[in-house]
Regions:
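Active-site-adjacent structural elements that line small-molecule/cofactor binding pockets in enzymes
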Residues: 1-192
Length: 192
Protein backbone atom coordinates (compact mmCIF):
# COMPACT_ATOMS: atom_id res chain seq x y z
CA UNK A 1 0.00 0.00 0.00
CA UNK A 2 1.19 3.51 -0.81
CA UNK A 3 0.39 6.63 1.20
CA UNK A 4 0.20 10.19 -0.06
CA UNK A 5 -0.01 13.36 1.96
CA UNK A 6 -2.19 16.35 1.15
CA UNK A 7 -0.52 19.25 2.88
CA UNK A 8 -1.72 22.74 3.48
CA UNK A 9 0.60 25.05 1.55
CA UNK A 10 -1.40 28.08 2.71
CA UNK A 11 -0.18 31.10 4.65
CA UNK A 12 2.88 30.36 6.82
CA UNK A 13 2.72 26.67 5.81
CA UNK A 14 3.74 27.69 2.28
CA UNK A 15 7.02 29.25 3.41
CA UNK A 16 10.32 27.59 2.40
CA UNK A 17 11.37 26.28 5.83
CA UNK A 18 8.05 24.57 6.41
CA UNK A 19 7.92 23.14 2.89
CA UNK A 20 11.44 21.77 3.14
CA UNK A 21 10.82 20.20 6.55
CA UNK A 22 7.55 18.69 5.42
CA UNK A 23 9.02 17.27 2.22
CA UNK A 24 12.06 15.76 3.89
CA UNK A 25 10.10 14.35 6.84
CA UNK A 26 7.49 12.83 4.52
CA UNK A 27 10.20 11.27 2.39
CA UNK A 28 12.04 9.87 5.44
CA UNK A 29 8.74 8.45 6.77
CA UNK A 30 8.20 6.52 3.54
CA UNK A 31 5.31 8.63 2.27
CA UNK A 32 5.00 7.97 -1.48
CA UNK A 33 3.65 11.37 -2.56
CA UNK A 34 2.75 14.88 -1.43
CA UNK A 35 0.07 17.09 -2.92
CA UNK A 36 -0.58 20.85 -2.82
CA UNK A 37 -3.93 22.63 -2.59
CA UNK A 38 -5.03 25.66 -4.58
CA UNK A 39 -7.57 28.28 -5.46
CA UNK A 40 -6.79 31.06 -7.89
CA UNK A 41 -8.98 33.44 -5.88
CA UNK A 42 -11.33 32.97 -2.93
CA UNK A 43 -13.99 35.67 -3.08
CA UNK A 44 -14.85 37.17 0.30
CA UNK A 45 -18.13 35.98 1.84
CA UNK A 46 -18.72 33.29 -0.78
CA UNK A 47 -22.09 31.49 -0.64
CA UNK A 48 -21.14 28.21 -2.38
CA UNK A 49 -21.03 25.25 0.00
CA UNK A 50 -17.71 23.48 0.37
CA UNK A 51 -18.74 19.85 -0.22
CA UNK A 52 -16.14 18.27 2.07
CA UNK A 53 -16.95 19.98 5.37
CA UNK A 54 -20.00 19.78 7.63
CA UNK A 55 -19.92 23.57 7.98
CA UNK A 56 -20.01 24.17 4.22
CA UNK A 57 -16.89 26.34 4.48
CA UNK A 58 -13.27 25.59 3.63
CA UNK A 59 -11.13 24.89 6.66
CA UNK A 60 -8.85 27.69 7.80
CA UNK A 61 -8.80 31.40 7.21
CA UNK A 62 -10.57 32.41 4.00
CA UNK A 63 -8.12 35.29 3.59
CA UNK A 64 -4.95 33.21 3.99
CA UNK A 65 -2.78 33.42 0.87
CA UNK A 66 -2.92 30.27 -1.27
CA UNK A 67 0.15 30.12 -3.55
CA UNK A 68 0.34 28.63 -7.00
CA UNK A 69 0.17 24.82 -6.62
CA UNK A 70 3.13 23.98 -8.89
CA UNK A 71 5.84 26.34 -7.61
CA UNK A 72 6.01 24.83 -4.09
CA UNK A 73 6.36 21.41 -5.74
CA UNK A 74 9.28 22.67 -7.83
CA UNK A 75 10.88 23.82 -4.58
CA UNK A 76 10.28 20.37 -3.06
CA UNK A 77 11.83 18.74 -6.14
CA UNK A 78 15.08 20.51 -5.25
CA UNK A 79 15.15 19.36 -1.61
CA UNK A 80 13.88 15.77 -1.97
CA UNK A 81 15.06 12.76 -3.93
CA UNK A 82 12.27 10.24 -4.43
CA UNK A 83 8.90 11.45 -3.13
CA UNK A 84 6.30 12.02 -5.87
CA UNK A 85 5.01 15.58 -6.25
CA UNK A 86 1.41 16.31 -7.20
CA UNK A 87 -1.14 19.05 -7.48
CA UNK A 88 -4.16 18.06 -5.46
CA UNK A 89 -6.08 19.48 -7.11
CA UNK A 90 -5.42 22.14 -9.69
CA UNK A 91 -8.73 23.62 -10.83
CA UNK A 92 -8.27 22.74 -14.47
CA UNK A 93 -11.12 24.65 -16.16
CA UNK A 94 -9.62 27.89 -14.84
CA UNK A 95 -6.46 27.48 -16.97
CA UNK A 96 -5.49 27.00 -20.57
CA UNK A 97 -4.45 23.36 -21.11
CA UNK A 98 -1.25 24.32 -22.95
CA UNK A 99 -0.07 26.23 -19.88
CA UNK A 100 -0.93 23.33 -17.56
CA UNK A 101 0.79 20.83 -19.87
CA UNK A 102 3.94 22.94 -19.83
CA UNK A 103 3.86 23.42 -16.03
CA UNK A 104 3.43 19.70 -15.36
CA UNK A 105 6.07 18.68 -17.92
CA UNK A 106 8.52 21.21 -16.46
CA UNK A 107 7.89 19.91 -12.93
CA UNK A 108 8.37 16.36 -14.21
CA UNK A 109 11.68 17.38 -15.79
CA UNK A 110 12.91 19.25 -12.70
CA UNK A 111 11.98 16.35 -10.42
CA UNK A 112 13.44 13.60 -12.56
CA UNK A 113 10.06 12.08 -13.40
CA UNK A 114 8.23 12.43 -10.07
CA UNK A 115 5.30 14.67 -11.07
CA UNK A 116 1.61 13.86 -10.75
CA UNK A 117 -0.97 16.20 -12.26
CA UNK A 118 -3.99 16.21 -9.97
CA UNK A 119 -6.90 18.15 -11.42
CA UNK A 120 -10.46 18.95 -10.44
CA UNK A 121 -13.47 20.74 -11.85
CA UNK A 122 -13.91 23.18 -8.97
CA UNK A 123 -16.83 23.80 -6.64
CA UNK A 124 -16.60 27.52 -5.80
CA UNK A 125 -19.01 29.25 -8.18
CA UNK A 126 -17.94 32.72 -7.06
CA UNK A 127 -14.33 31.91 -8.00
CA UNK A 128 -15.41 31.08 -11.55
CA UNK A 129 -17.47 34.28 -11.69
CA UNK A 130 -14.47 36.34 -10.53
CA UNK A 131 -12.41 34.78 -13.34
CA UNK A 132 -15.24 35.22 -15.88
CA UNK A 133 -15.42 31.49 -16.66
CA UNK A 134 -18.90 29.94 -16.95
CA UNK A 135 -19.41 27.64 -13.94
CA UNK A 136 -21.80 25.45 -15.95
CA UNK A 137 -18.99 24.55 -18.40
CA UNK A 138 -16.47 23.34 -15.83
CA UNK A 139 -16.93 19.58 -16.33
CA UNK A 140 -16.82 19.86 -20.13
CA UNK A 141 -13.79 22.17 -20.00
CA UNK A 142 -11.98 19.74 -17.69
CA UNK A 143 -12.62 16.76 -19.96
CA UNK A 144 -11.47 18.68 -23.02
CA UNK A 145 -8.41 20.03 -21.22
CA UNK A 146 -7.25 16.54 -20.23
CA UNK A 147 -7.48 15.45 -23.89
CA UNK A 148 -5.56 18.56 -25.00
CA UNK A 149 -2.84 18.04 -22.38
CA UNK A 150 -2.34 14.41 -23.39
CA UNK A 151 -2.16 15.53 -27.03
CA UNK A 152 0.49 18.16 -26.25
CA UNK A 153 2.57 15.66 -24.31
CA UNK A 154 2.28 12.99 -26.96
CA UNK A 155 3.72 14.38 -30.17
CA UNK A 156 6.30 16.82 -31.51
CA UNK A 157 3.64 19.24 -32.70
CA UNK A 158 0.03 19.09 -31.68
CA UNK A 159 -3.16 20.13 -33.28
CA UNK A 160 -6.16 20.24 -31.04
CA UNK A 161 -9.56 21.48 -32.10
CA UNK A 162 -12.06 21.45 -29.27
CA UNK A 163 -15.11 23.43 -28.29
CA UNK A 164 -13.20 25.58 -25.78
CA UNK A 165 -9.56 25.28 -26.84
CA UNK A 166 -7.83 25.32 -30.21
CA UNK A 167 -4.11 24.67 -30.51
CA UNK A 168 -2.44 24.78 -33.93
CA UNK A 169 0.96 23.25 -34.71
CA UNK A 170 2.22 24.02 -31.23
CA UNK A 171 5.30 22.16 -30.05
CA UNK A 172 5.48 21.74 -26.29
CA UNK A 173 8.89 21.81 -24.64
CA UNK A 174 9.92 20.23 -22.42
CA UNK A 175 8.11 16.91 -22.71
CA UNK A 176 7.46 14.96 -19.49
CA UNK A 177 10.23 12.59 -18.36
CA UNK A 178 7.65 9.92 -17.56
CA UNK A 179 6.31 8.09 -20.57
CA UNK A 180 2.78 8.65 -19.28
CA UNK A 181 2.70 11.34 -16.61
CA UNK A 182 -0.19 10.40 -14.30
CA UNK A 183 -3.28 12.57 -14.24
CA UNK A 184 -5.45 12.14 -11.14
CA UNK A 185 -8.96 13.56 -11.40
CA UNK A 186 -10.80 14.62 -8.27
CA UNK A 187 -14.44 15.53 -8.72
CA UNK A 188 -17.91 14.93 -7.32
CA UNK A 189 -21.36 15.76 -8.56
CA UNK A 190 -24.18 14.63 -10.81
CA UNK A 191 -22.40 15.26 -14.13
CA UNK A 192 -19.01 13.98 -13.07
Amino acid sequence: MKFGLMFVNVGPFGLPDHLENLGRCAEEAGIESVFTVEHVVVPKDYKSEYPYSPTGKMPGDELAPIPDPVLPLAFLAAVTQKIRLGTGVMILPQRHPAYVAKQAATLDSLSGGRAILGVGIGWLKEEFEALEIPFSERAARTEESVRAIRSLWGSETSRFDGKFYQISDAPLCPKPVQERLPIFIGAAGEKV
